[in-house]
Amino acid sequence: MPYRKYREKKYETKYREAFKLFQEKIGITFTDEKLLIQAFTHSSYVNEHRKKPHEDNERLEFLGDAVLELTVSQYLFQKYPTMSEGELTKLRAAIVCEPSLVRFANELSFGSLVLLGKGEEMTGGRERPALLADVFEAFIGALYLDQGLETVWGFLKEIVYPKINEGAFSHVMDYKSQLQELIQRDGSGNIEYQILQEKGPAHNREFVSRVTLNNVALGLGSGKSKKEAEQQAAAEALKKLKEQL
């Protein structure tokens, strides 16, 4: 056997063993292991092999992007029944953005599994954020094709959803959404907003709002609209609750 073929065979064997351990780690066994390997195959690796032992992961990345958006959207829709469409969109964007996907990928050491060409390897491709984010999406696409949406949901329930519950993305929410998220996380009860006062002429109206938790006042706020007053009340409530933590 020519040395190059021997080296490639040894390389493949090493990675097959790594993929076996990876599946054991996540508790999921692929029916079609070729899909799993394809998810981690960068185009640079395919370009350096004439016979193309695997397809690259770009098509799986395309599919995984859509599957990830769908599943995260469904989770947020169910978890935050009072959150507006705009806030849901903003929160979803923070969860599926590149830095977040890189964080998820690094948590499972995705970089160590990627099949790379020599040039990409030498230039640090294994740690490149865009590459890792793409691999995470490709893995979601492969998992969907191999086992369906239910298994994808179960995987995200272990890796992604807990971070939402821990408040990792609260910084992109408005004050009312942040307060709702904090209360839901602690299981403390129901939040209600009341407009206590409207004052001033019609062209310069001022509203005063109060937010309560289980009928206990948490914060007061004022603003030129009911929405602004509620946001300010929520901001004061958040400040108080965080001081107590």
UniProtKB/Swiss-Prot annotation:
Reactions catalysed, as given in the entry: Endonucleolytic cleavage to 5'-phosphomonoester
Residues annotated as catalytic: 65, 137
Any GO molecular function: ribonuclease III activity
A Gene Ontology biological process term: rRNA processing
Keyword annotations: Cytoplasm, Endonuclease, Hydrolase, Magnesium, Metal-binding, mRNA processing, Nuclease, RNA-binding, rRNA processing, rRNA-binding, tRNA processing
Domain of life: Bacteria
Cofactor: Mg(2+)
GO CC field: cytoplasm
Stretches assigned to the DRBM domain: 174-243
InterPro entries: dsRBD_dom (IPR014720), RNase_III (IPR011907), RNase_III_dom (IPR000999), RNase_III_sf (IPR036389)
Leading EC class: hydrolase
Protein family according to the UniProt entry: Belongs to the ribonuclease III family.
Protein's UniProt name: Ribonuclease 3
